[in-house]
Amino acid sequence: MAKKEVVKIAKLQFIAGQAKPGPSLAGVGINMPEFTRQFNEQTRDRGNEPVPVEITAYKDKSFDFRLFTAPASFKILQAIKAKSGSANSKTNIIGTLTLAQLEEIAKYKLPDLNTDDYKVAMHTIAGTAKNMGVLVEGWDDVKKAKEEAKAAKLAQLKAEAKEAALKEAEKELVDSKGKEVEVKLVGEEEQSESENN
């Protein structure tokens, strides 16, 4: 049997059981209704999770596809019941996972990771969680991480206040250009105060 000529390999993501023909599929060059029917059939039991899929399109317009597990970020957010990760994980901790939750997510993602060891997978998932502003109890030093985040937030606020003060001073300097400015020397202020007493 001759090997089919691959025209394109596309990596897409659809909600389980809800794929529809659209622009993302049109560029792949496959029979969209047939793909969506097969995809929806195979993912119907996966709830409402996003399902990454790799589609291989062949020259004869046929196709194959491979399904993957939901993204780790989705599973982490699902575990902590959050809608999105932190915009700045260094200053904003949005939640914590238990070690059991971390292990469960790592074992779930294991088929798609480049390791067979779930403990290595746990390191990968813990790193993803940390980048999202999610700590793992018993893995991260939660108290220390929260203190560091608080200190980083305070430093960020101070830096923003300093920048605002510098911009205000710069504006005042520009506004006073060419105008007469009264300047008192420190020694003169002290002298006038002692004369008044």
Swiss-Prot record:
Pfam families, per database record: Ribosomal_L11 (PF00298), Ribosomal_L11_N (PF03946)
Any one Gene Ontology BP term: translation
Gene Ontology molecular function: any one: structural constituent of ribosome
Family indicated by similarity: Belongs to the universal ribosomal protein uL11 family.
InterPro entries reported in the protein's UniProt record: Ribosomal_uL11, Ribosomal_uL11_bac-typ, Ribosomal_uL11_C, Ribosomal_uL11_C_sf, Ribosomal_uL11_N, Ribosomal_uL11_N_sf
Signal peptide residues on this chain, from the entry's feature table: none
GO cellular component terms, semicolon-separated: cytosolic large ribosomal subunit
SUPFAM superfamilies: Ribosomal L11/L12e N-terminal domain (SSF54747), Ribosomal protein L11, C-terminal domain (SSF46906)
Subunit structure comment from the entry: Part of the ribosomal stalk of the 50S ribosomal subunit. Interacts with L10 and the large rRNA to form the base of the stalk. L10 forms an elongated spine to which L12 dimers bind in a sequential fashion forming a multimeric L10(L12)X complex.
Name of the protein in its database record: Large ribosomal subunit protein uL11
Family annotation (NCBIfam families): L11_bact, PRK14539.1
Species, as recorded: Mycoplasmopsis pulmonis (strain UAB CTIP)
Gene (UniProt): rplK
Family annotation (CDD domains): Ribosomal_L11 (cd00349)
Keywords: Methylation, Ribonucleoprotein, Ribosomal protein, RNA-binding, rRNA-binding
Source organism superkingdom: Bacteria
The record's account of how the chain is modified after translation: One or more lysine residues are methylated.
Function: Forms part of the ribosomal stalk which helps the ribosome interact with GTP-bound translation factors.
